[in-house]
Swiss-Prot record:
InterPro entries: UPF0178. CDD domains: PIN_YqxD-like. It comes from the Bacteria. This is UPF0178 protein VP2328. It comes from Vibrio parahaemolyticus serotype O3:K6 (strain RIMD 2210633). Pfam families: DUF188.
Length: 147
């Protein structure tokens, strides 16, 4: 199992949790972003900078991901693509996306996108709560323990 992080929008506190888990378990971890993501100098932790552009980082993750890898992302379409390839997808809020739940999440995302494009203010996501941070760390630990 390898860990792939969609680091463009990953909160710093979640990146720190991921780094600690990678250091503790030795799992190979790559942060993919269109900007420099500082990571500690460890043999198993990497940063991959891709060119700026729409979905460039997402496409690179999809290209490299393999079955049973874990992708950390809050990007629903990216989660759908990696699940289709046999990987796991975990949001930075601790939600494990599955084949059973991802289509409903895509429908909600598309509905909200339609609302926004028609001028309705939908607001952004709430700030990351302590409960969500804990949920993320717990899910990540459970997944890494099974590898």
């Amino acid at each position: 199992m390898k860990l792939w992080v969609d680091a463009d929008a990953c909160p710093k506190v979640i990146r720190e949790t991921i780094v600690r888990a990678a250091e503790r378990t030795g799992v190979e971890c790559t942060f993919v972003a269109n900007h420099v993501v500082p990571v500690p100098k460890r043999a198993n932790i990497h940063s991959l900078q891709v060119p700026a552009g729409f979905d460039i980082a997402d496409n690179e993750i999809v290209r490299r991901v393999e079955p049973n890898d874990l992708v950390i992302t809050s990007d629903i379409p990216l989660a759908d693509e990696v699940i289709t390839k046999g990987a796991l997808a975990l949001s930075s809020r601790g939600e494990l996306y599955t084949k059973d739940t991802i289509k409903a999440r895509l429908n909600i995302r598309d509905f909200m996108e339609t609302m926004r494009s028609s001028g309705i203010q939908t607001g952004g996501p709430a700030a990351l709560s302590q409960t969500e941070r804990r949920e993320f760390a717990n899910h990540l630990d459970r997944i890494l323990a099974k590898r």
